[in-house]
Amino acid sequence: MQLNFKRSLALLLLSTSMSVYAQQTYTARVVNQETGEPIIGAIVSSSNGEKALTDAQGRFSLPLNENQTIRISYLGFTPQSVNSKSFRNGMVIGLIPGIDLQEVKVTASISSARSKKALGSNVEHVDVSKLTANEHANSLSDILDGRVGGVQMYQSNGKVGMPIRFNMRSGATISMDRDPIIYVDGIKYNTSHISDINSSQDALSALNDLPIEDIASIDVIKGPSAAASYGAEAANGVIVITTKRGSFNTKENNKAAIQVKMSLGAASLARKYNQFVNNDPLNNFFETGWQKNLYGTVSKSFRGNQNMFFSYNMNDVEGIVPGNRDQRHTTKLAYDIKSGPLSVSATASYVHGNISLPQTAMGRYDAIWNLMINQTPWPYVEESTWRAQSWTYNNDRFLGNIRLGYLLPGAVKLETVIGVDVNSTKGVYRLPYGYLLGNNNEGAKNVSNRRNSSFNWDIKASRRFKLADKWNLTATLLSQIARQYETVNAINASRFKGDVDNIAAATERNVSENTFEQRTWGLYGEAFVNYDNRLFINAGLRRDASNLIGSNVASIYYPSLSVAYNLENQKFRLAYGESGRLPYPTDARTSYVMDGISAYGPTVKPQFKGNPNIRPERMREIEFGTDWTLAKRHNLSLTLYAQYTSDAIIYENLLSSDGWIGSIPRNVGRIKGHGIEFGYNGLVWKDTNKHSLDVYANVNYQANKVTDTGGSDITNYPNVIKKGYPVYSFYYHTVEKTALNADGTYNTKMGAVESSDYKYLGKPFPAVNGSFGFNLKLFSNITFGTKWNYALGASVYNQSFYNTAGLGDNLKKRNDQLTALANATVGTPEYEKIANDLAYTARFRANYIEKADFLRLSNLNVGYDFTSLARKLTNNTITSMKLSFSVQNVFVITNYSGADPQVEGNGGNRKQRGIGSLSRDITNAPHPRTYTATLSFTL
């Protein structure tokens, strides 16, 4: 017995000593494979459960047994696994920046984020942090335009703070409300533009408050096939913005990470005017606009799985139009905590802005019109009067959310998000006393106070079920309550006795107040099936209810279905979905106004006739696509889609003889659309880790056609909605011949003879558009990149030149023709040719609907990474440093004769009742060329 005990004890000691001998503590270092810089906070885990984080030098220590595997991962890098057999003390492990595109987490629906390989639709993900590291961006359009297939977006004109026009896929809708829904960290963002004290073209964009430097990534959901889960307003797609926050991958006892980014830039007129007899006053009117930006962040992890992120952004941007300036301060605080089954995230950001938006277009008293129309400038208003006026908006905006997640018993995951967006804006227009504007030299002052707010509360429950071997089902149920409320009161005062700041002293005053409220409730159910991580099937159904008047608006259903199948290097996807657009708030309401007083009391008369049976517009979309990965370096994507819009709202004119004025809405419109999207990005050249060349390109084709208008055309000439033609087509009389007097001389009053019929003259959307560019790295430290945008097939109504040709004397082409005509002999072939040419420069709409094809070098950037030198000189106090220089809107090649082929006279897209207009150049301010130098460093 004693002998057996001694033998057992000896064996135990021997095995223990062998185990201790087999397990050793290894030390290694993790670096960026391309730059050699240490990666701080990388997660190192072994197959037996041991974990470690890399320190400030990228080092870690971990006990390992023989034949174990360790995995090293860090956000933004491809994870790497190493077997302990090949592990050596002091070895250096390099992580490759970037991750497999199919593994990128993107917003799949309102209820979930999934890897791209699980998506049946083409949802595009943009890593904004990476983009803004090399190039400067002032607006959302600078980031997304040209980088997302099937999407075209640009500012309506070249001033600071202007609205953005969105062209999403085929644009198969009659509605002027063409903006996508925008979410920021789960907050439904209010996108209403503000034009309370100026014209719609010079409106203040709601997107001006977006914190560009704070954006980490953007997911773009382009159509109903993917956006059906977002309900009744998602036909234009959804843009999901995720802002920066702290990371759980950093050590608790690490010092706070501090990042600073400083930019200094200048904007100037990109294309000088040469289309006029006297160009100097117009070219000299524009000035250099200086731009300053300071951005700083502090992030820190704390004990107990907590982290905090703080940022501050100062933006001071001047435009090229005198007086156009945007001064904005933004602060943001984000907090995250994970404790067992509970996770809590909260975000609060505050924007204080002051922007001056001088009015330069849309009226006879505006600057560009007065500089363009006549050879002698300022015919309708004195320059001193225009410069004395001021249009300013002061706005304060708060964005806040709280997100809670909890894992209930039974593996049910419960999540809720509450989001708030509150924007208060005060607009003030001033015409000082003593300056003559029209017939008023006694001053004017308009004041508006607006409060736009949005609230959303989302709550969802989800659970994963194992159906069979390799088969899994995730079921989700989500409820969303949303409220949008807008109120504005305004007072317009004029004709003072002196100081215009005392509104009570005005002899003419007008007060107005308007409110708008929209409440919606959506219930969304989703079933997501996963087979062997290769086949993914997603089915969803959304039911929406709204407070808008109308029996058919109270309850609406939107289904969706998608399938994705993955091979080793290729994915096939198919998706179908439905969404829509809600009617205008007053479409279902019949209203009357008081007409007087009778012996029996007040009398009323009809004002607007509503349609209580009005339905939301419905868009159905199906898309098919495939994605390839070739040689692990090249990624290609091809998507084909078709859209079918029914119940489009057409406004039929009412007969005044029936006692009504205006129009009544009816669901009689139908439109079809289709398109193709092709994208490529790849690493086409790499030499060790010092040199590389990345190339990207996308090509998009889109078309739409109106198939029903209820039997009548809807016109806002030269834009029309007409069966058989694209929506908002240009459709008008054409010029047939010149106008001659009986003696053979040119009739300058008539100008030309128009055709009696109408003809199709173009459309406001390009048939083909896209972008291409490259990013080059040399010697590890030097970067050089470009982005080119192009479009073919769109037209623009050049209303600026149309008016100048007939109402002024400054259009050079026509002026030269008139001069040549005066020197020619009546009745000669030369005279007849010049007279015929004059017919096509006369003030007729068809003469000024122009092709607007273009190729634009949108961005050119170069940078140098000083990290190694900075670390050496500061003893690692500065952990990274980069200097970059970028130029935006370098040049454009176009067949459009106006200031810029990408302008929008109505100020972008907006909510309005009835047909509007698209692609009109109404003395729009041109887009500037911008130069920006940026220095960024991390402590």
Where are these regions (language model features)?
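N-terminal periplasmic "start-of-domain" segments of outer-membrane beta-barrel proteins
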Residues: G49-R59, T107-N134, G161-R165, H193-S200, ...
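Short acidic/polar hinge/loop motifs at secondary-structure boundaries
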Residues: S61, I187-K222
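Extracytoplasmic beta-strand/coil segments of soluble accessory domains associated
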Residues: D142-K188, S217, A227-S247
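Conserved small-residue
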Residues: K261, G265-N278, R666-K672, K686-P764, ...
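Flexible loop and strand-edge segments within Gram-negative outer membrane beta-barrel domains
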Residues: L264, Q291-N313, V317-N324, R328-F398, ...
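Short, acidic, small-residue-rich periplasmic hinge/interaction motif at the N-terminus
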Residues: V31-T35, A42-S45, S73-F77, R88-L131, ...
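Surface-exposed loop/turn segments flanking beta-strands in extracellular/periplasmic regions
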Residues: Y273-P281, M362-S384, V428-K445, Y485-E513, ...
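Extracytoplasmic gating/loop element in the C-terminal half of outer-membrane beta-barrel translocons
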Residues: A267, A791-K882, V887
